[in-house]
Each structure stands twice: as C-alpha cells, then as structure tokens.
C-alpha cells in the first residue's frame, strides 16, 4: 500500500462522468425499476433491508453461480459484493449444496441439538483458540448476546466501542457510526450519537466511543470513566475496521488494547462478523496473533444461510453455562445452518483456499496501486485475505475522523457506477470493500483492475 501525492482532480469532470454513468445504469436496469415499483406496494422502501437501498432504485438479482451473478435484466457480473462479505465460498458451491440437500432429507428444524452443531463448535474452538461457543442467527444477534454476557460477567453496564464501527442493528451499538465530521468531537471525548431514530437516549449514554488505532485515547477515556464509577463491561471492536473500506490496525495497537483491557478487567470482544473466515482460517484473531476474551461471527460462517456464533473463554462463558445469562433462540444451531457451516469449514475453507485468496488479493491490490501511480490518482489500495478496497484519499485513513476528513465521496460514487456498468457487482455504499470468494480467479480480479484502469484514464483525460 502506498498513498499517491496526486494533482487535484477536475471536480466538474467527476460530476459529468457520474451523470453519464447514472444514465447508462438506469438504461441497463429497466426491469429492476419495474420490480422496485412492484416491491414498494408490499415491502417498506421496496427492499428487505435498508442497506439494500440505492437511488433511484436497487439492483434486483436473480441468481448466482460461483463468482458470478445475474440481475433481473440479464446483466452478468463478477461478484465482488458477495452478500456484504457473506459468500466467501462462492455461490451455489456444490459441497455446500450437497450438505444442505442431505440435511433437508433428514429434517430441517427441531429446536434440539444435533451432531453437526458439536462438530462446528469443535472446529471453531480449534481455529480461534476459544473453548466455549454458542450459536445465533446473525451478526446483530451475536454482538447483542456477547455484550449481554460481558455485562453479566462483570456486573457493569457501560459499553466501549470504536467510533465509526458498525456492530449490528441493536440499540446498544447503534451509536456513533455515521456522523458528520463537525459532530465527531475531540479524540479524548468523542460524541455518543444515535444512528437513526428510535434509540433511547438512556441507551446512547451507556455507549462510549473512542478512535481506532489510538490506544492512548482509549486509556485516557477509560480513566475518566473509572473516575466516574462507569468502568466499561466490555470493549467491542473490529480488529480491522471494515466499514470505512478497509482500515488496518497499526503495529502493536491490538496487543496494546489487549493489555489495557486485561489490566482493568474489561472483557475484550473482537467483532469478527466481517473478518472471521474471510481474512484467515481463524480470522483477525489468527492474522494478528491477539486473542480476545470473546469473538462474534456471522456472515461467511453460514455459507449463505443465516448463521452466527459467539466464542469465549471458559471464565467469561461460565455465566451462560451456569444459567445466569439466557442465551436463547428458536433457530440457534438450526440443522441446515450447522450442516452448511460444517461442510464449509471442513471441505471448502481449507488452507489451500486461504492461500488462493491471499494470492488473488495480493494481485488485485498490487495492480490497483499500479493504476493509481500510473494516472496520479489520490488514493491507495489496501487489502487482507479476501477483503480489500481502493481508498480515494490523499492521505492514509487510520480512523473515522481521518476517513470523514479525507475520503473523496464523489469519486467513490463514480467508481461504483463504473464497476456496475462494466460487469463488476460491488456493494452499494461508499464505505464498503470488495470480498473475493474461493471461486474467484485471476480472470475475475484482472477484470476489476481493467475497469479501474478505464475509470482512471477517463477521469484524467
């Protein structure tokens, strides 16, 4: 990764290209427009989740196979979206399909434990080095339950998180996510602000945010909270921020956080909903060699089925084992979900698969950096495992404040449109990253780079 000292870009040129590409995309997605009208009659906003929205209409998909998806207009695209990072196995993987079919014939739901659930727990314990596990059905459920367990274990209420990080849609963590730059606050006293309506102020006040990559600011905020008799129950964080593109931890940062939380008896939770099974076999915990007290998983865990998990130490998870905390859910450990997960862990996400993902990501990141240098674009490419992005910023992004101060939102919008119009399906947000799957090839990543080169050439001509 290298940042580029680039000349200013013609802003008018960016806006002209955005308008051109918007017209092209609208012309290519007429059936999506029609489907949006129909969907609005029964689905609020025309979609199943607010994160599926885009203006003037969402792109409705019809099917996927391996690294490729087709929308309802028949447009074929390389899938770099991969279900917000859930499909690192690729679409319709035959191993996963076989496991689901075999399980379906034996029954799909009992609300009772199965042998597959045990096997998955054993494999997760091996990969993460955390002995005790429970299941959920989503990332939001995983982080919600993990925080409840941490509160029960410590007897404390306050939660500390990283400013700008997303940890699901439950009230405790819907705080200090998308905030305008002038409302962020100072590093040692960042604001606690609700992410949307309907979140009680009392809940907001119990969640305290600190900047990423700044253990000094975290320590100073902790000292203030302790002086106020508000020592946190937990620190919940992504080891690498995955909703500002990709922001990697600085050397020594994660270990310093581990040491600080251990010193104060605060439960450290790594939210690996996005990184888990995507950047290494044991996620960020393996990648950077720092073991937290708890880990939360979802997304790629279920290989396309709704599946989440919480892992923890014997000590922390004892409050679940002894019945102090009711960690429950009718569909927790659903037979279809654990069957798909078991097949994925044992037969698909193998050491060879991770070597393949690492090689592909090195290829795409290196090639994108070459394009940036060739055309003098303001930005850099960064990636880890199956995850990566081009960050349009004249300086390196290290936290939310530097992201809001420097990210070129218009250029990010233009890049998304360019990709969509040239067969690259990407996530619909300025803050998202690509996710490769084990079925992606050099042809797929080279196609991404080719489109990026065309964008740079068109922009700088």
Annotate the PLM regions.
Residues 2-461:
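Conserved N-terminal phosphate-binding loop of PLP-dependent enzymes in the Aspartate aminotransferase
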């Amino acid at each position: 990764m290298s940042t580029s000292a680039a000349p200013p870009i013609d802003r008018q040129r960016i806006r002209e290209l955005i308008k051109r590409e918007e017209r092209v995309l609208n012309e290519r997605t007429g059936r999506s427009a029609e489907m949006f009208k129909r969907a609005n009659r029964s689905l609020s906003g025309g979609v199943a989740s607010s994160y599926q929205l885009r203006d003037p209409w969402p792109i409705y998909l019809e099917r996927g196979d391996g690294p490729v998806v087709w929308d309802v207009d028949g447009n074929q695209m390389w899938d770099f979206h991969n279900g917000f990072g859930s499909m690192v196995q690729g679409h319709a993987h035959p191993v996963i399909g076989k496991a689901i079919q075999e399980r379906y014939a034996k029954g799909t739901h009992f609300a009772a434990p199965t042998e597959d659930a045990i096997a998955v727990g054993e494999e997760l314990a091996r990969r993460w080095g955390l002995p005790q596990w429970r299941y959920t059905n989503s990332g939001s459920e995983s982080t919600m339950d993990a925080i409840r367990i941490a509160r029960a274990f410590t007897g404390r209420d306050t939660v500390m998180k990283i400013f700008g990080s997303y940890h699901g849609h439950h009230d405790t963590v819907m705080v200090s996510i998308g905030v305008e730059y002038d409302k962020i606050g100072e590093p040692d006293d960042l604001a606690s602000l609700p992410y949307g309506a309907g979140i009680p102020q009392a809940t907001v006040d119990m969640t305290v945010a600190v900047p990423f990559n700044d253990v000094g600011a975290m320590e100073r905020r902790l000292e203030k909270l302790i002086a106020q008799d508000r020592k946190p129950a937990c620190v919940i964080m992504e080891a690498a921020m995955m909703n500002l593109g990709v922001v990697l931890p600085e050397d020594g940062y994660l270990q310093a956080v581990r040491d600080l939380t251990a010193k104060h008896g605060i439960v450290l939770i790594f939210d690996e909903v996005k990184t888990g099974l995507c950047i290494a076999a044991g996620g960020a915990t393996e990648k950077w060699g720092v073991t937290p007290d708890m880990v939360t998983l979802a997304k790629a865990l279920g290989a396309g089925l709704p599946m989440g998990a919480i892992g923890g130490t014997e000590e922390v998870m004892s409050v679940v084992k002894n019945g102090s905390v009711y960690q429950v859910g009718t569909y927790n450990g659903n037979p279809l979900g654990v069957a798909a997960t078991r097949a994925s862990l044992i037969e698909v996400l193998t050491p060879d698969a991770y070597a393949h993902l690492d090689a592909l990501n090195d290829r795409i990141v290196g090639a994108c950096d070459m394009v940036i240098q060739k055309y003098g674009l303001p930005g850099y490419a960064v990636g880890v495992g199956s995850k990566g992005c081009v960050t349009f910023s004249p300086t390196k992004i290290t936290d939310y404040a530097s992201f809001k101060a420097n990210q070129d939102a218009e250029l990010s919008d233009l890049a998304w449109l360019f990709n969509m119009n040239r067969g690259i399906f990407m996530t619909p947000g300025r803050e998202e990253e690509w996710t490769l799957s084990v079925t992606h090839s050099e042809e797929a990543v080279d196609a991404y780079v080719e489109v990026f080169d065309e964008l740079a050439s068109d922009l700088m001509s």
